[in-house]
Amino acid sequence: MRIILITGISGSGKSVALNVLEDAGYYCVDNLPAQFIPDLACYLADQGYSQLGVATDIRSRESLARLPDTVRELAANHQVQVLYLTASTDALVQRYSETRRRHPLSAQVDVGAAAGTPNDTSLIEAIEKERELLSPLAESAHRIDTSNVRTNTLRSWIKELIQDENENKNSQQLTLLFESFGFKHGVPSDADLVFDVRSLPNPYYDLALRPLTGRDAPVIDFLQSQPMVLAMAEDIRAYVEKWLPSFIADNRSYLTVTIGCTGGQHRSVFIAERLANYFRAHGNVLVRHRELAPAG
């Protein structure tokens, strides 16, 4: 059975991710304590199910410490993947303000507040407390930073992860994820490697290229004509290729390589696509452009 466990910070999009799994045919359960997952997997396997999605988070606080042991137990008989969703504190505060919902830990840090009344100070304390409690889980999971991500973009990312795992379900290879981003929107917190390409010639200053992206032919032609761009792309490729065996030896499932320019529209997109095209010949590769709307 293939099992995807979704955990992470409250308000980061776990419900969206679980809904994508459900739409993809997974048997999904929300807020299930970790100690019950093996029995559920066994029961569903006996019933003929082959895919299970489970969300577990701070609401099942007492059982979260058992999750690493549960994952090891499940991995003995099943294909298991853990997704950890997170977001910046500012993004989470804004989301809670918009929905008027209370954080699961709010009662512990703001017992005097009226029910249903957001309090930025206590909310920030609750978010940081949750981040601290969940930090051990983030270290061993595939992290997804949703800070500047629209809901439809997150759905597309989860679909890509599912598709990648389906295509490589019998493979133990590490998956390389190349992600472009704009520094003005913040560095992705799920990055394993961060490369800054802001020193490269910028197509933004060409009015004909400004509305385009690094996936469009005119921008590609412009950047490919710049020796500095090609040299930096080659240096990044060489670095990743040299150290990739070390990351594989560390038993990682994913390595997230992020490339940032100023706005995340041109240079970083071009470099990410170029690297992805090269490394596809070496194994499992995904490419993601945080600041661009998903295709289609």
Curated annotation (Swiss-Prot):
Binding site for GTP: D57, I58, R59, S60
InterPro entries in the record: P-loop_NTPase, RapZ-like, RapZ-like_N, RapZ_C
Swiss-Prot/TrEMBL keywords: ATP-binding, GTP-binding, Nucleotide-binding
Sites where the protein binds ATP: G8, I9, S10, G11, S12, G13, K14, S15
Highest taxon in the source lineage: Bacteria
Entry GO MF terms: ATP binding; GTP binding
Cell membrane is among the record's keywords: no
Residue ranges that the Swiss-Prot or TrEMBL entry lists as coiled coil: none
Pfam families per the UniProt record, alphabetical: PapZ_C, RapZ-like_N
Free-text function comment from the UniProt entry: Displays ATPase and GTPase activities.
Membership in a protein family: Belongs to the RapZ-like family.
This protein's name: Nucleotide-binding protein Rmet_0297
Organism: Cupriavidus metallidurans (strain ATCC 43123 / DSM 2839 / NBRC 102507 / CH34)
Organism phylogeny: Bacteria, Pseudomonadati, Pseudomonadota, Betaproteobacteria, Burkholderiales
